[in-house]
């Protein structure tokens, strides 16, 4: 199985196709599989990279580091792209994948050609609503029954099943250290920023082109203001209408009366054709612009009018 070690963390990845590199990042802490339909549609024209972030899928569980989890994901994504020779790449994703792709463009602009995102997570209560699921429930488990109780939670039990080496790493962790890191990550995650763990000042530094989809209502996790903030703050951002109609969102979307069993992973695959077509058009436009600029530079250098 293909792994790459970035700053001591083993990251699982897969790649398909040839052409401009695209790295796809899913939402939440889910694995890469929800984006497989989109990868299939992109692979005839692109080099598509699917990956599991730290603490996701088959990659290592590592609860530590000075940065927030979101910024660690971006740092390690940059390292992955460099090590496999895929930088610069187009970073695409939804929800957690949207904010991680934006964070990658903030922290490592040299590895990003463009950002393509949907279901941008943020808004007045987004972090507050998500922090208990991301962090709070595991802090409570650790305080109640130590690391053995954490290992018995559905999420971490799956991490050990997907990657057996995670068992020893998780069970050998100091409970106090685990809780300290998780509380710090939770506090950063819950802070009221325009988009996830990114400030207005950070978003303004993004220099690459960005295409994003408008948010939907009702959705307090991916509030409509999050996408609007990206459009307002990022210099080269363009917004497309939501991939969902109001009638579709009423039964599929992320809100109190969502149809049972519909998660973000399901939603992404249902709109894979829409996202893939828009992303390919975006890539063609950026690549065409670069070719035109290169031609103009050569022409100017040789003095051709």
Show which residues each predicted segment covers:
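Hydrophobic, aromatic-rich cap/lid helix
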Residues: 171-201
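Short beta-strand/loop motif that positions the catalytic acidic residue
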Residues: 206, 212-214
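Catalytic nucleophile loop
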Residues: 93, 97-98
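Active-site loop/oxyanion-hole signature of alpha/beta-hydrolase fold enzymes
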Residues: 50-92, 258-274
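Catalytic active-site module of serine/aspartate enzymes centered on a nucleophile-bearing elbow/loop
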Residues: 236-305
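Conserved alpha/beta-hydrolase "acid-adjacent" motif
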Residues: 219-226
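Conserved HGGG/HGGXW glycine-rich cap/lid loop of the alpha/beta-hydrolase fold
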Residues: 5-61
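Flexible "cap/lid" loop of the alpha/beta hydrolase fold
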Residues: 99-107, 113-143
């Amino acid at each position: 199985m293909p792994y790459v070690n970035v700053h001591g963390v083993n990251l699982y990845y897969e790649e398909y196709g040839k052409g401009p590199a695209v790295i796809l990042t899913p939402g939440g802490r889910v694995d890469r599989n929800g984006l497989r339909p989109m990868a299939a549609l992109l692979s005839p024209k692109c080099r598509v990279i699917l990956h599991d972030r730290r603490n996701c899928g088959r990659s290592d569980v590592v609860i530590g580091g000075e940065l927030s989890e979101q910024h660690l994901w971006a740092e390690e994504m940059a390292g992955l792209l460099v090590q496999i020779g895929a930088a610069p790449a187009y970073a695409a994703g939804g929800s957690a994948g949207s904010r991680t792709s934006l964070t990658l463009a903030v922290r490592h602009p040299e590895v990003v050609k463009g950002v393509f995102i949907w279901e941008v997570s943020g808004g007045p209560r987004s972090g507050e609503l998500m922090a208990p699921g991301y962090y709070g429930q595991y802090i409570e488990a650790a305080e109640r029954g130590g690391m053995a109780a954490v290992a018995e939670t559905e999420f971490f039990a799956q991490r050990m099943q997907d990657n057996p080496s995670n068992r020893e790493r998780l069970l050998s962790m100091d409970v106090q250290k685990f809780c300290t890191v998780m509380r710090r990550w939770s506090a950063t995650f819950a802070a009221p920023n325009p988009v996830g763990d990114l400030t207005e000042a950070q978003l303004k530094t993004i220099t690459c082109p960005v295409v994003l989809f408008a948010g939907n209502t009702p959705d307090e996790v991916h509030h409509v203001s999050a996408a609007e903030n990206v459009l307002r703050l990022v210099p080269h951002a363009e917004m497309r209408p939501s991939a969902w109609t109001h009638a579709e969102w009423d039964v599929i979307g992320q809100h109190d009366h969502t149809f049972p069993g519909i998660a973000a992973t399901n939603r992404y695959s249902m709109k894979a054709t829409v996202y893939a077509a828009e992303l390919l058009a975006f890539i063609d436009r950026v690549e065409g612009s670069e070719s035109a600029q290169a031609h103009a530079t050569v022409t100017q250098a040789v003095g051709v009018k």
